[in-house]
Amino acid sequence: MNLALNLLYKRGFLKQCTSLKVLSDLMDREKIVFYAGVDTTSSSLHIGHLIPFLAMMHLRQHGHMPIVLIGDSTTKIGDPSGKSEMRKILSSEVINNNALSIKNQLQKITRFSSSCFIHNSNWLDNLNYIEFLRDIGIHFSVNRMLSFETYKRRLDFGLSFIEFNYQLLQSYDYYMLNKIKNCKLQIGGDDQWGNIVSGVDLIRRKMGVEAFGLTFPLITRSDGKKMGKSEKGAVYLDSSLYSIYDFYQYFRNTSDSDVKTFLYLFTFLEEDEIESISNFKGNSLNKAKEILAFEITKIVHGEVEALKVQEASFAAFRGSGDRSNIPFFKFSFSGLEEEILLIDLMLDSKIVPSKSEGRRLINSGGVYINGKRVENQNHCITREDFNNNEIELRVGKKKFLRIVL
């Protein structure tokens, strides 16, 4: 197998591929243009979106030429893949702002030049609908489209005609990139398989050449939960939506059984180093988790920020060092009040989702103020609890928050 493809396979990226042997031989002979698309439904990607772009970085290291297709036009329709209901229709202004934000985010992570980023509005916004149906729609079988899991699943919930067009438009994207950029490979999550193979088929029919598609597994944790979700919601790559400290801690808290898998997927460490790290046992496995958390934080947020939150994590768990990057909640006593119920403070700071959960944690001995366990659910915080205008609130073993006056 081609070296680049073999690397993706060994690191756990490869799920399905059209004509793998033919693609491998082609990549042995020449450096190919390949692409992954991203819709602009949000101002930020989350960690679950990152896999295709990490794979792109591996392929780029082997000399292949990436294109990131910004789906500013297809976002106006919405991809039904993996959805049980129609996406909310966004305004053009929101879509354009999201497109710029995501492009900047991916440029920072991948270090790809601006020329690697293309918007599909370049060709989709001015399509003539009648000509599109005559030239492109004629190559699509409704029966075949309905055989794909994306559409089969949605038929039970309702599928709008506008969403039904999505596969044609994504296939047209691939066709256009093949036509103007000689792009020969589309990569994406496995939920995109139907859209990708339809594009491969359209290129064969329209251009008379073979193109290829490759998908990655949808990453889940060993507990069955979807990768990229946390108690605080989606693990966004934008630090204003999900703090860098919490991002680091998300990976620092990886379950033992996921460490090796995530080291292969979310870092660029060499195979022998990963195998060595993965053999850590007992408490030493925490070191492997620290390495994982540092490496992926470095990729997404840069080495300087990764070092800061790593030091903050060490300070929180070991009780010494620079604590300034531990998340904080700005608090002030209201009016003449000189105390506040701890339960209320926990809820205000969002370290717990409800007062009942706060009471449960206190009663089970899982809440600490400045390292001292809280015994009473009616415990009050006073000014005397603050040292240098802050206190440390810990919930459970892993949640730390500085309360700052």
UniProtKB/Swiss-Prot annotation:
InterPro entries: aa-tRNA-synth_Ic, Rossmann-like_a/b/a_fold, S4_RNA-bd, S4_RNA-bd_sf, SYY-like_C, Tyr-tRNA-ligase, Tyr-tRNA-ligase_bac-type, Tyr-tRNA-ligase_bac_1. GO terms for molecular function: ATP binding; RNA binding; tyrosine-tRNA ligase activity. ATP binds at K229. SUPFAM superfamilies: Alpha-L RNA-binding motif, Nucleotidylyl transferase. The keyword Metal-binding does not apply. Its main location: cytoplasm. A motif ('KMSKS' region) lies at residues 226-230. GO terms for biological process: tyrosyl-tRNA aminoacylation. Residues 340-404 form the S4 RNA-binding domain. It catalyses: tRNA(Tyr) + L-tyrosine + ATP = L-tyrosyl-tRNA(Tyr) + AMP + diphosphate + H(+). Keywords: Aminoacyl-tRNA synthetase, ATP-binding, Cytoplasm, Ligase, Nucleotide-binding, Protein biosynthesis, RNA-binding. It holds the Pfam family SYY_C-terminal. It is found in: Cytoplasm. Catalyzes the attachment of tyrosine to tRNA(Tyr) in a two-step reaction: tyrosine is first activated by ATP to form Tyr-AMP and then transferred to the acceptor end of tRNA(Tyr). PANTHER family: TYROSINE--TRNA LIGASE, MITOCHONDRIAL, TYROSYL-TRNA SYNTHETASE. Homodimer. Belongs to the class-I aminoacyl-tRNA synthetase family. TyrS type 1 subfamily. This is Tyrosine--tRNA ligase.
